[in-house]
Design a protein with these regions (language model features):
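S-adenosyl-L-methionine
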Residues: 107-131
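Conserved SAM-binding loop of SAM-dependent methyltransferases across substrates and taxa
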Residues: 79-90
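Conserved SAM-binding motif I beta-strand of class I
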Residues: 93-98
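Conserved beta-strand signature within the Rossmann-like core of class I S-adenosyl-L-methionine
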Residues: 165-171
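N-terminal auxiliary segments of SAM/dcSAM-dependent transferases
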Residues: 1-27
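Class I SAM-dependent transferase core
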Residues: 25-66
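Conserved class I S-adenosyl-L-methionine
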Residues: 69-76
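A short glycine-rich, Lys/Arg-flanked "PGG" loop and its adjoining helix->strand segment in the class I
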Residues: 152-165
């Protein structure tokens, strides 16, 4: 009788627990959603664009390391400024990847500035598969959330899957 009650109660508790968990996001999904909303904020993007030392660093690094004809990934493109700088440097193809809604603004800015050879890709980096390996991965995967966002894992994944041997990761 006790075994029967335990089984009966246990299965009911399990079913109730499953109902409670339906639709609940994992911690990774919750963080990805938060991160997407945070960096989709035009205010946050404006703050980053106004950071003169940051912008000068990226401009100089792109000028120095991206060669005309290179294939480039701009991971977490935001407004697309790094993709635009790579295009201006002469990259043959730039993949501007972002999983946040900011990507629509990046597309609009690129069209308004007649930027070509930039493919805007709305996905997470782990789901991105370019037609051919790339020469350079540009990113700004830094900050106090380095491990929370799986930034190291995401960069390592791209490096292992899509970066040419001898390719660069900037910074």
């Amino acid at each position: 009788m006790i075994t029967f009650l335990r089984r009966r109660l246990g299965s009911r508790l399990l079913a109730a627990g499953r109902r409670l968990l339906e639709g609940v996001q994992s911690p990774d999904e919750q963080y990805r959603d938060f991160n997407g909303r945070y960096f989709a904020s035009l205010h946050e993007q404006e703050r980053m664009l106004a950071d003169q030392p940051r912008m000068e660093f990226y401009r100089a690094a792109i000028q120095r390391h991206i060669q005309p004809g290179d294939r480039v990934i701009d991971l977490g493109t935001g407004t697309g400024i790094l993709a635009a700088l790579a295009w201006r440097r002469g990259a043959a193809q730039v993949y501007a990847i972002d999983h946040s809604p900011i990507l629509k603004h990046a597309r609009t800015l690129a069209e308004a500035n007649r930027i070509e050879r930039v493919e805007f890709v709305a996905t997470h980096s782990t789901a991105f598969f370019p037609a051919a390996p790339v020469d350079v991965i540009l990113h700004e995967q830094m900050g106090d959330g380095l491990f929370d966002e799986a930034m190291v894992a995401n960069i390592s994944d791209l490096r292992d899957r899509v970066l040419k041997p001898g390719g660069l990761i900037l910074p």
